[in-house]
Amino acid sequence: MAPSHNVVLLVDTAESSDKSRLRRVSLRLLNFLACRAGLGQVRWSYRFLNSSGGRCRPPRRSDLRELGPRGWEEFEDELEACWERARNCRPSSTQSSRAQLLQTALMETLADFQWDRPDITSPTKPTLLRSRRGRIVAADEPLKDDSPDNFINPHSRNSIFLLSSCPHSGTELGQFAATSGDFSTQKVMDKLLPKSLQKIVSSKRVRVYWLDTSDWTQFGSSSDHSGYWTMVELMHQVEGRILPSESILGSSCQKAKTLPSFSVPPINIPFESVLNYLIFSEPDYQLWFPRRDGILFLTGKDGTKQLDCAVSLEPVSMIQKLSTSLMTIELKGTMQNCNLPLAGLRVETWLLHNSDCVQLQKLTKELMLKELHMIATVTLEDDVLPRTGILSPLSETAAVLNVICSERTLGLDNLHVQGSVHETDKETFSDLPDIVMSVLNHVYSSEDNTLAPDFPVPEWIKQELSQSSRWTSSVTARWYPLSGVSGASCNLMESFRLINAASSNCDEHLKFDQELTNYLSEFYQKKSVDDAGLGVHRENQKKSGLPRTPVRQKMKTLPRALQMLNAARLNVKAQKADSTLPVPNEKNSQMKRRSSGKQDNKPKQLKPTEFQSEDGLISYIKENYEEAVSLVDHSTMTWARDTLTTIKSYLKSIGSEQIETEAIDKVKLLFKTSKVIRQNYRNNQDKEVKLKECQLQVFLRLEMFVQCPVIQMDSDELELIIEEITDILRIVSLTEDPLFLTKFLEVDVLTQYIASVPKILADIYFSLGTQIPEVLVLVLPSDGDDSIMHEEKSVKSQPSTSRVPSVAPIGAETDQLEDLRTRSAKKRRSTALARHRSVAESSQSFRQIEVPKRQPNKENVQSNAVVVLEKLKLPLPAQPQKDAEAKVRRNLFIQETRSPSKRCSKMPRSQSVSAVESLKRKRSKSHDGSKDHHKLLTKKVSETPVHKQTANRLLLRQIKGRPSESNSNISIVEESPEKEIRDIDLRRSPRIKQLSLTRRNSSSFYASQPKSRNLERVNSATQLQQSRERPGSCLISEVKTPKRLLFGEVLGMISPPTTKRSRRILDMVNPVYKTPGKTPRKTPSKNIPNFEDQSGNMLVKSPCTPYTPRTPSRTPKRLKTPSKGSTERKKAAKNLGKLFSPSKPEEKSPLKLWGRRSERLAQMTPGKDGSPYKQSVCQTLMEVKTPQKLQRLESKDFRTPSRTPTRSNNTTPAKQSMQISNTPRKSDLKHPQEHESRGPSGYILWTPQKRILASVPHTPILQTPQKPISASVPRTPVCRTPQKAILSSVPSTPVCQTPNKAILTSVSRTPVYQTPQKAILASVMSTPVYQTPQKPVLASVPTTPILKTPQRSALASVSHTPSPKKYIMKELTVAITRMRECTPEKVLGSNLSSSATPSSALKSFCSEKTTSVCQTPKKSSIALLKPCDSLEFSGAPERLMDSLCSNKDSTKAETACTVPSQISTQMQNVINAGECTDSLSQTSVSSPSIPFTDKSLSPDLKDALSDVTSSKAEGVTIVSEKLDSSSMDSQEATDSFINSSQTEESIDISEARVVSTEASELKMKVLITRKPSGSGVSYLPTTPKCLGNVCSTSTYGLRCTPDRRQREAAARLGTPEIPAKFSTPKSHCKMIPQSIYEVELEMQESGLPKLRFKRTDSNSTIDMDVNKTPKISRKRKGDESPFNEKWCSKHAVRTEPACVSPSCVRTSHYTPGKSGIQTFICQSYTPNRCLSAAASPSQSDAGVPWTPSPKEKLSTDVINSWPRKKKASALCTNLLKCDKIPEYAEEDGGDFELEGVSKLLEKSPVIEQQSKVDGGTFGLRSRKRVFSLVSPTKETENPVKRVCTFNRHEDSSTATHRHQTKEEMEIFSSDQSRSSYLSSSQQSICDDVFNMSDFTPPSKVPKNPLSACGLLTLTQSPLLYKGKTPSSKRKEKIQDVFSDGDSDHGTPTLKRPTNPAAVSDDSPFRKVNPLRSISKTYSRKKLIT
């Protein structure tokens, strides 16, 4: 059966002016196709598009359906609805050209339909089928035209008709393609039909037709049609056509009067003719309308031919008299106003073409101009009379010739056709010439002789013949092909015969009537039998048809199943009867062969009896063979058949018993093997003879198969012969060519043997390795075991002429019928009778339908408008039909699996078998995030589940009917057979979903995006910690998940007071993050609306973040980290460190992981205060976990696909909180809860850094520290990435904002997210800094950085133009966030600190919010931001501080979020941006002077700050990852701080608390719970040295190594030649260097984590006292290269990119020549492990405080001497947060761990002392290179090394920001300011430390650096500091340490607490669990030069 025609109408609803026109065009088109192909052969569907940019809903029915009234009604209804929507909706804001929109619509249409699905129809379909809609169609009724099946081009069987207006003029074409200038066809082609789309069209065998719906009357007066002809040419190139709607509607003539007077009225050609020509294949079309040649000449008055040219003529109608004779056209004269239709003349129309004759072209052109027609005399060679013609010009090369048919000529035609002429007819033409009359008489007489005598014809025959005036009795034999239309059917003729037979009294004419009827009946029955494939009947069997018996009548009324069964039974009967026939009918075959015309050329065929003996026969056939080979024109197939027949006849004549066996032996005497043939023709060049012999050998063997079926019983022999045939055919192919072989097989072999030995032919094709032709495929029998057709056992009868395979008998009829019944029950719908292999095998051999991988953003596409816009270019997967499961014919060919969510939603629970075993048993453990508990039953499903191939009912029947199969080993997986492991792990049943807090809010059963394991663990860990924090609460959950294994102890040690609040907050928030795979039932967005209550932020309601409760705010799931693999996920639980390892492609970007980890830690270890801040942080983290929702909320703002939506900060409560803090001005300093209630405007940015929010128990300060986005800024997608987007609409800059994320809260409006890859920080906020961090820490932002080369994008130098404080800070935050996000951490992941770029971006942002940082990811340099000289962050800080103060009782420790008063006013200065140059361009942030004066802070705030600072800075958790507190501070102080870290890092930091050692000073003791991302850039107001000039860093080319990329990103942002300017704000608060603690967490065999707490960042302690050292800044010597320092020898192995957070942008961190900053924190070595006498951070003495090694030991040698412990958690910056860590005083002078680490820019004397390394050697030497950032002089002053210390001067909140945005700031901070530099270096160090997972500690024990949150938790943990002196006693030390270190929370500068408990190995934190490490230990990879 011919395949059906698939037609899709793609209707443009943009123009609804002429609705009726569009309807009529569509209807006439469908009507035409139905008439042409048959009503039952057309399947259609429709799609709508709006070329003006609006959206159209998909139709209710998305499948291809048969034509019917109901479908048309639905089409009209939906079309009207689309018009209505198009009229009401406003055009899209995106400026997409019409061509682009059409291209997208074509892509979707091609992907939505199954174009290649075969049409499965039962061969026993009843005569009438009543569809479900009541339409009755006759199955055997040929509804299509009598055109051959191949009339339609195979490609046109799949057609897309685009119904839209086509551009006509050049102007319209330019608007269509949105291009200007020259519109070449190629340009338009690239816009509309790019090569990718053309490939899809070609692969799916689809033709695209453009149906121009525009009214052509509108263009009649226009002379510019260049656009239209360009489109025509374009469509021709893709084998498409443009169809004018006028040709279909036929309205051209009616409206011709509207055309201009000079134009020629169009020809009224039937639209069917136009469509036939345009749609159907050219070769076949030419067969139907053959061209004929003609001669056109014009004779002058003098008789000379003035014009004589050859022309070609094509008929317009098939009714015309077609002839190949020559037509002569003689032009006679001209005429005007010719209207043939009005004249009522019958005409034949021909199209005349000539493109060569210039004279003719001139003539036609002249005729067109003068509106003239020419009269011509037309003469045909076979015409009796000449005719009159009218020539009408169409164009210069074409004209229309209308030949008038007069009545006389019509009469002549009738005479020819009718075949009977009466005397009256002759009289009628008596006036004709005698010669004509004689010819006519001759014709008539010949007709009379051939016709039967005039006899009465039966009435019914007269009626039939009367239907056509041209039919005569001679046509009756050709009646059958039209019988279906005329009504003469087999049954009808049989009934006539029976009726006539009943009459006994027959007259003479009645007898003739009866005889004619009998003949016709027999003829039709025979034809029907042959077509039905029932075989050839015996000659004497007159009546082969089946009488219309009552049984047969009854069958008509039976159900379809019974009809099929009975039909099959009858077929078996017929086959059984046929099998009794003699095998070949030699007599008939010989007679036929003898009758052939070629028989004369053959030697005389001897009779079998003429052979005297067998030898005579053999010699005869051999001679005959030689003659056949020599005769090239000899018919090889006929010869082979004759030979076999002769042999068998002889054997029969001698009475042989085994005729076939003996015949085979005789024939084999003629066989030659392929080897023999090669040898014989080795030297023979006669190719023809060789080919002839090969063909003879093939035909001999095939004929033997046919005439000697017994050989087919021997499978071995059969296989050998087939192999030999194959070898011979290969010789043919080699001798000629494969094309010759293909033709030989298809033309000569298939046509003769396809019906007799199809399987053998298939085997031959298979052996050749070529594709089996479709014709053969249709005939091949089913291979099913239950098939009734076992051809190998059946005796072959005569070859069947039908292609429909006949059913061969295989035993007794009863057995066959039983088999039939069984099969019918089993395969009710599988249509086994159809021999299509794909159908017949459905139940036996399970088809291995390839299950495509889950569509990346399939759900996003449905839920996110932005994503849809971005994905329009991609073909959308076909939507499986709802009823597909119930229909086998549908199900077999569904190429795409249904989405798991849909399947699960429909699947009964009883069938919802999970792919993981023991799910219930381990349900209690499911929320812990450990995927090890889930063990896949099968790693790979090799076969598609049965239920995907057959309907359930059919499957059950098959299982019952074939119990043997039910015992098969195939296990039926009732859910999608193949899923990524992460999907399986993430999936939870609805009940389990509710149980787990880690669940994300997602309506889908499966996570739309993979969720980071790290994030999961962090969240779960934080939850556990919170649960433990509750006073008196015992561990609720066992420490068995990786989170608990890694952080269990830490969590358990969380201070109880915060536990309840955090738990409550978490509950309220419904932590999305808890289950990476799952979203909590309540999506964060849902919670977000409630955020007013919790955090005071209506994040969800902010316009930016549309509230989509189902979309988890954490979109990370959707954002698949490209590198993340399912296998890694399996191992995640086993090795959490691996997850954190950036190098592992499977795992998410390390930054993300770190950030998450830190978040977990932050949540886990809130502060000792137990401030709600931690809780809020946890909430934030949780919310961050549900970035999807955030994304959804923000998706509106983001036009880019949801790459970074995961980071939607708006969603995350933390972001909201941050927003609150961002607008402290708006929010009173009252209790943070009040701020929370304030709403979007007063969003407190709950950033872990600033525990200000802590006081607000419900607002998750840290919840998504990295991502916290100012909820108030709904528009800014920056917030989307929790890390990055802190931007709140609140004008005031959120001091507390998540440092990493949106430092620039004000920037909230600008969607940071807009173009992740290319988003430019143009207007600081405008371009989402965070666009898509490659490694979004929390947000599962796509790992690919939005800024594709964020590293390269450098923030243009930021001028110090002041901008509104709020906005500036916001913008800074946003910029930082964007930078972070823009520079994916992976990109930064190379040693380049991720923050480097962000920090620079932040700097630039800080410098000027308005200035667009332009983070063009790759190379676009960030536009210069005008430095915000007075970026007043103070307002926000004050309010923040006030709010913090108000809450200080509960959140003193949490005041980290608060920015010191210094920061407030001078943050503006800090924000004054340095400049970030393009790739590796040096980022110089000059913060002229950022005096952090308490002036900006209200007295209350100051008090609060002092209290906070005095309270051990324990609450200070600097989110150093993305934006350290330095970033916040630097927002005010320097832009460099802003770039401290990428958003992801910031997210990692759970909280930062600022503890002022002295009442007047605010020291940040950063306990970073954040992820281990690099420490934020320290804000060093005290280092005025750098103020003067910006530290310059030389740009270097990027390294390919991943670990270089981070460094590279940082390097880009830094300008080495310019020393970092760090204006030291003259704030009273000292910048306390953040102490970074390296926490090595080893998993013990017991499953409990063993934590070794090590202080690593003492290196970059800076005296934050601005007043004391306001000008202290480290300047690099003029020629000093930041890379001239040696790397720490311990980092010999390069870290994997993900592990190392981007190092500071400082050139000191850069590796020379590697353009990437490779900052490794040697301090990250575990103190216990390091025995260096130089007070290396690895000091093992528990009682010894962790102090930076003496400055004399800062040398690289000392560093190199350290034990090779490469992992250090630099994120412990906020360890001071715990009051119990008093020992961290900076006074010790050396970082307990950072001894080998070069100092950061020395803001404080400590830094200077330590940075004594020549050239300001950066104390932190990562990997054998020492960075020389700090001038040696300054370094010497500071004994403690500073990697990148936060300026204590910066607010603790800023420090927190810096921590969070540490990575960002690192990127930004390079060279921007000394403090910035320090902070950046710290960040880099912190990043390195935390990312040190890449490093293998010298001990070879994988130690996981603990994230900031973890460190914070550790420091606060009572276990760690039991019996230790309170941190208050150590204020001085801490202040000293943090003066530089605070700002650099991540810097290992912090000395080891002298408190022995802190250092002692007894502390659970100090104990390293050898089994597991928090982060993967990586050996540093070698640098790639």
Swiss-Prot record:
Phosphorylated during interphase. Cdk2 promotes both phosphorylation and formation of a ticrr-topbp1 complex. Residues 964-974, 1105-1114 have a biased composition (Low complexity). Residues 823-837 have a biased composition (Basic residues). One of its GO terms (cellular component) is nucleus. GO terms for molecular function: chromatin binding. Pfam families: Treslin_M (PF15292), Treslin_N (PF21854), Treslin_STD (PF21855). Residues 999-1026, 1085-1097, 1201-1224 have a biased composition (Polar residues). One of its GO terms (biological process) is regulation of DNA-templated DNA replication initiation. Its main location: nucleus. InterPro entries: Treslin, Treslin_M, Treslin_N, Treslin_STD. Residues 574-609, 791-858, 894-974, 999-1033, 1072-1156, 1184-1243, 1849-1875, 1938-1966 are annotated as: Disordered. The keyword Phosphoprotein applies. Belongs to the treslin family. Interacts with topbp1 (via BRCT domains); interaction is cdk2-dependent. Component of the replisome complex. This is Treslin. It comes from Xenopus laevis (African clawed frog). The gene is ticrr.
